[in-house]
Amino acid sequence: MKTFQTFDISAEYDAIHRTFPCHKDAPVIGLTGNFQEGACTLLEGYFTSILKAGGIPFIIPPVDETNSLINSLNALDGLLLTGGADINPLFLGEEPIKELHSINPRRDRQELLLAKLAADRQIPILGICRGIQVMNAAFGGSLYQDIHVQMEGERIKHDQDLGRGYASHTVRIEKDSLLYKLFETEILPVNSFHHQAVKEVAPGFRVTARSSDGVIEAMESTECKSMMGVQWHPECFILENNTCMMPVFHWLIQESTSFREAKKLHSRMITLDSHCDTPMFFDQGINFATRDKKILVDLHKMAEGHLDATIMVAYLKQLERTDEALSAATAKADRILNEIEEMVAKNCTAVDIAYTPADLCRLKKAGKKAVMLGIENGYAIGKDITNVERFRHRGVVYMTLCHNGNNDICGSARYNEEGLGVSTFGEQVIKEMNRVGMMVDISHAGEKSFYDALEISSKPIVASHSSARALCDHPRNLTDDQLKALAAKGGVAQVCMYGGFLRKNGEATIKDAIEHLNHMVNVMGIEHVGIGTDFDGDGGITGCASASELINFTRRLLLERYSEESIRLIWGGNFLRVMEEVQRK
């Protein structure tokens, strides 16, 4: 029976609003538009595949205006780099060969920038044909301008005469790859329409599929990021009512949905990193408003990772304990705190100092980032107990009792000498910290120092950047008994992103950090854990290598089925509860 098109828009409009809500939430996927003959175009297969997979396609026109690009990315949950013309070899530092086909300068600059800016924001990316080449070029890889003249050996046909929705050759997939998980096969029939290809994969990526003649057909991130590229055109198959390539698009929608949900969570809660050492780089001329490769925390990276606040510490290396050396340590602590305040003042429209949990809420509502002040190593106060109150009046929210060396307050985990705990002076310091409202931090403290501090303190104490010794036997980590004792007194332990505290052998990744967190939750309870990255103090691991990647930690928490309330507690709720209790007079 034939149905005829109706032209009653009012009826359709009314039908949309017969129930509430009238739509389902879905991730918004940006698709790069082609540009030819003065028009922005996009082949049907791209947006149809995104729609069929459950996403909302949003076409990004080839514009040069940077502000437009960034605002577009901030509205997106995923990015699909589409196919099209050759890439101008000048962007890769090469001269064109005579076999180069047409190029599209309007697209090249925009898409290379889009790929890098999207990756900074941890936006899931899928590259198709030209798109995989754009990804590779953007991150430092190389391309063949023409595989037929620049690759050794014979080539199979890579520009098929068959219809676009039909396979013309096969690719072999690596069994340990994401692509294999999606298709569950080593041999995959694909279509092919290209003469350029990836030559050497960019750092941070690996080859996951090749054609029989050795051409790279797929690559993926080796840094636990949602980034994948394929050389064929999976979007063409759906137009032949063939769903064989839909796993690629389902992957993009799944990753983008996770990213979208993580962004929403961050918008509804305070996210706090309880420990970073960025001031250690102040003498290298860094600018907090510049995205600086030397540091892991700056305004750009905080915004990209959706991090609201960080506690920057004045770190003091443990040196001699002579009167002169102690006086110099106190002066250095003051100088570093001054430098933090000056850095914030220079960027006062975007960031401010927070002294209390209430300040954090106020600054988030104002659209500003927050920096809190800390001191790493009680060496800073010398032997002068009055420095505790003076530093508290400066706004210091916590002080780590010691660092990698014994001091006049307590014994360090670095040496963990038997019987060396909190000294008589150290007991006075802890009690004074309780009195003035400064949190006691026992990261770096030896085991006896830990238990002594727990016994002496009348307020809950924190471990601002420590992990679980049961999973990584390092003296800086806390045993299960220590974790239980800390929780019993209302304290909090913050998982550290330093690789050496997460695993003994091999390279640590975000998966290891999640395992430590899960273990600590099981031992302590959800009300006693948090995140203290130690960024710029040797913290930073694959998958969570800077403040820009902290949104990935939230995505992992969602994958582990943590509730929104649990994630809120992990992301600072627990730590700020202790801060409020300690600061309460």
Language model: regions and residue ranges:
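Histidine-centered catalytic micro-motifs
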Residues: 192-197, 230-234, 271-278, 396, ...
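Active-site glycine-rich loop that binds ribose-phosphate moieties when present
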Residues: 420-433
